[in-house]
Curated annotation (Swiss-Prot):
EC main group: transferase
Induction of expression: By jasmonate and wounding.
Cofactor(s), names only, from the UniProt record: pyridoxal 5'-phosphate
UniProt keyword annotations, A-Z: Aminotransferase, Pyridoxal phosphate, Transferase
Top-level taxon: Eukaryota
InterPro entries associated with the record: Aminotransferase_I/II_large (IPR004839), PyrdxlP-dep_Trfase (IPR015424), PyrdxlP-dep_Trfase_major (IPR015421), PyrdxlP-dep_Trfase_small (IPR015422), TyrNic_aminoTrfase (IPR005958)
UniProt note on tissues of expression: Expressed in roots, leaves and cauline leaves.
Molecular function (Gene Ontology), one example: L-tyrosine-2-oxoglutarate transaminase activity
Protein name: Probable aminotransferase TAT3
Entry EC number(s): 2.6.1.-
Family statement: Belongs to the class-I pyridoxal-phosphate-dependent aminotransferase family.
Lineage: Eukaryota, Viridiplantae, Streptophyta, Embryophyta, Tracheophyta
Further information: Induction by wounding requires COI1.
Length: 445
């Protein structure tokens, strides 16, 4: 008996009949957020430098990438109107759904209606809703790109969907290895995910390649989940082409948001669009599953949904042009600075998104085992946090976010250069190592 008259319970864990859900830990372990902020917590001040954390893909913190005044005013006006203080309908506010449909329609041969669109709390929630809606069959599997965006992996793990990977080919402008994709599929495959414009590779797929992807999906009898959040961050020569153009070949679920194009990821507004002119999603119950799942989840802010039509319709093209111009400058600057850091190689200059996807050559560095080791030591020595490629499914690659001010890009490469200079194996050592290997080969022969 405790002094306050309350009996102390045995503190051993087996007294209690509840415990945390281990599936959440398994899923969170593969997220970028877990990795990046874990590395952030391991930063030390030994370098005497401020922490550079250009990894979450959020350029909104920098002056050249602030969202436009028209978007800010749309949100303020929605809040002042008094018309957006209630709960929103589960599928989304009708005017927001209609505005997204009109925004996406463009050159689509079959136009979307408001009823084909569902509003979500950013694209990540859209991913969760779609993945969970496909996870009813315990033997089902999904095809994900390698490299790719790990939130798909995380949600598939949490939902119990088996993950199978297909490769993107650096020697072919990061096109999908369609033979490998077909080999990875079986009778339990339900969907493939395509990210276009591509995070992390920065490529934009051509019309011909997307047509081949659609034909392969039809052959396999699977849907295409097309992640198009970077559709407004294209600065190369290839135009962005929506996957929905090919929905008559295979049904397409398009995922998107205003986070990247309008540089406001904290606003959390995204969407799911059902490109399905043949009614396949209805006949297979996918539409019903998504609508049921929307009834289980919290709705996005009514204020943001009320503002969404004005955000999509009233943003001037000059806003996007300014942002694209800044990204082009940063890409050129980064590629120039990479010439002084030969352990990092960019196989293809990016055409979109806000990243450099770089191959890491550890043979040029002392005491660096792999990409994770590289990034961990970079944090410790330079207070610079980058994403190791293994987190995106590709060992010995590194992702650098360059969606930031030019001065920050310069500082990123100053620190990378300093790190490389300290760890670089001298050319003489490389020659000696090669000579030793040749001597071994000769002696064996």
């Amino acid at each position: 008996m405790a002094s306050n008259g309350v009996t102390n319970c045995n503190a051993n864990a087996n007294v209690w009949r509840f415990k945390g859900n281990g599936a959440t830990s398994d899923a969170a372990a593969v997220t970028l957020r877990k990795l990046a902020f874990g590395m952030f917590k391991n930063c030390t001040m030994n370098s005497g430098k401020t922490i550079l954390f250009p990894t979450p893909g959020e350029p909104s913190a920098h002056s050249n990438f602030r969202t436009c005044p028209e978007a800010e005013e749309a949100v303020a006006a929605a809040a002042r109107s008094g018309m957006a203080n209630s709960y929103a309908p589960s599928p989304g506010v009708f005017k927001a759904r209609r505005a997204v449909a009109e925004y996406l329609n463009g050159e689509l041969p079959t136009k979307l209606k408001a009823e084909d669109v569902y509003i979500t709390g950013g694209c990540n929630q859209a991913i969760e809703i779609v993945i969970d809606s496909l996870a009813g069959n315990p033997s089902a599997n999904i095809l994900l790109p390698r490299p790719g965006y790990p939130h798909y992996d995380a949600r598939a793990v949490y939902s119990g969907l088996e993950i199978r990977k297909y490769d993107l080919l650096p020697e072919s402008d990061w096109e999908i290895n369609l033979d490998g994709l077909e080999a990875a599929a079986d009778e339990n495959t339900v969907a493939m995910v395509i990210i276009n414009p591509n995070n992390p590779c920065g490529n934009v797929y051509t019309y011909d390649h997307l047509n081949k992807v659609a034909e392969m999906a039809r052959k396999l009898g699977i849907m295409i989940i097309s992640d198009e959040v970077y559709d407004h961050v294209v600065y190369g020569d290839k135009p962005f082409i929506p996957m929905g153009k090919f929905a008559s070949i295979a049904p397409v679920i398009t995922l998107g948001s205003i986070s990247k194009g309008w540089v406001n990821p904290g606003w959390r507004v995204g969407w799911i669009a059902m490109n399905d002119p043949n009614g396949i999603f209805v006949s297979t119950g996918v539409v019903q599953a998504i609508e049921d799942f929307l009834d289980l989840t919290p709705q996005p802010s009514f204020i943001l949904q009320e503002a969404l039509p004005d955000i999509l319709e009233k943003t001037p093209k000059e806003f996007f042009e300014k942002k694209i111009k800044a990204m082009r400058r940063n890409v050129e600057l980064s590629c120039e600075r990479l010439k002084d850091i030969p352990c990092l190689f960019c196989p293809k200059k990016p055409e979109s998104c806000s990243y450099l996807w770089l191959k890491l050559d550890t043979s040029m560095l002392n005491n660096i085992k792999n990409d994770f080791d590289f990034c961990t030591k970079l944090v410790s020595e330079e207070s610079l946090i980058l994403i190791p490629g293994v987190a995106l499914g590709a060992e010995n690659w590194v992702r650098i976010s360059i969606g930031t001010d030019e001065s920050v890009v310069q500082e990123i490469f100053d620190r990378l250069k300093g790190f490389y200079d300290r760890h670089a194996i001298s050319k003489e050592a490389i020659k000696l190592s090669g000579h030793a290997i040749n001597q071994i080969v000769v002696s064996v022969n």
